[in-house]
């Protein structure tokens, strides 16, 4: 429509970014499963002798740290998604604004879900300094992007419910 001609190039660029982001998130699903396998294996290691216990602890610590990497990346990608959704909600068609609200809610849910996967691993880490750093990064993403997703959702709800 003529009404959206001024932002058509912006929307096309957003579509390209969103498609690339979707593909990255899909790949992270498998990466998350792949990262869990070594952690599961570490839990199964024997700890009957002091040497075995020390080996298990070291392997487990490394696996816990690695198991945080993918959920943190998922969180970063969800944050990118929320930023894209802000633009869609501001520039997109009124007929598609509900899609922006849905995307904001889903990105927020995925962001929060991924944070739980970080927290369950950091809780079990022996290196409390490393765990605190990972928790701080997770908290920062939650603090910024949950509120931004909520703002998009509220804005879209307002547009849909009020004339």
Task: Set out the residue ranges of the language-model regions.
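Conserved, well-structured ligand/cofactor-binding cores
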Residues: 1-163
